[in-house]
Amino acid sequence: MQVVVFKVNDEQFAVEASKVQSINDMMEITKVPKSAVYIKGLINLRGNIISLLDINLLLEIEQGTLTQENIIILNLAEESVGVTVDQVDEVLEIEEDLVEKVETDKKRGYIKGVINFKDRIVTLIDIEKLIKK
């Protein structure tokens, strides 16, 4: 399985690469008045208007001191959605058995498990569950 590893406020997360359409540098965001608090706004990506979500709010992580540098565009149920992250680190090929299941409460049901990879632990998230919550 391939995963895209990214950082949010010094924590490392991963999503399955099959869900990732593209990785882009930060671009101009158009704010949407009276939208849900987790919606950062809209971006125009090669003529396509895409909703941009604040992954910090979805993951319930405080905004870090770093500027969010990247946008990950995800393909979810025939819809493209973007999430802003501090930094995209790498794309890794991992064996399924490296993913350790973790007990989580229903509130954190979007966590698929943790990847104990070399000298670090990366949280693998089910991005569809996270966005639907």
Residue ranges of each PLM-predicted region?
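An acidic, low-aromatic, low-complexity terminal/linker signal
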Residues: 1-133
